[in-house]
Amino acid sequence: MKTYTFGTLMDGSEVNAYTLESDHISVNILNYGGILQKFLVNGTDIVCGYDSPVDYQNSAGYQGAIIGRYANRIRQGSFSLDDGTVYQLAKNENSTTHLHGGTSGFDQKLWKAAPFSDNGCEGLSLFYISPDGEEGYPGTVCAQVTYKLSGKQFSIR
């Protein structure tokens, strides 16, 4: 596995890229948002990725990123639990809707990276702890995403 500095965010934070490789496949994963930045099959890139972290920050899309805490829209940016507690979330779509985790969702976080290799399989696990109250959500969430490449098989879990 190759690891290199992909670039810096607008606040100066460093973003790293991790390259998983097999005979015909090469995959670049960023620790920023868990973004699948490049996916080469026999030398042809099959994803729409950018060449710098700032391009991802300036994009209105979520290209290749981990989405969360919630993927999709929450109308009026609020929800309630069975006990009647109402939670107001960040509204980041037309000032009325909570979209894909809010103004600073999982796609915009620097994740802790743990590369690994095992019996011809290269992999990368990313970890992020979303604290209670982040983007208005209750409770702490410990998130993990694992990417694996073995021969022609690539998986994300």
Task: Give the positions of each predicted feature.
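Surface-exposed acidic/polar loop and edge beta-strand patches at domain peripheries
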Residues: 1-157
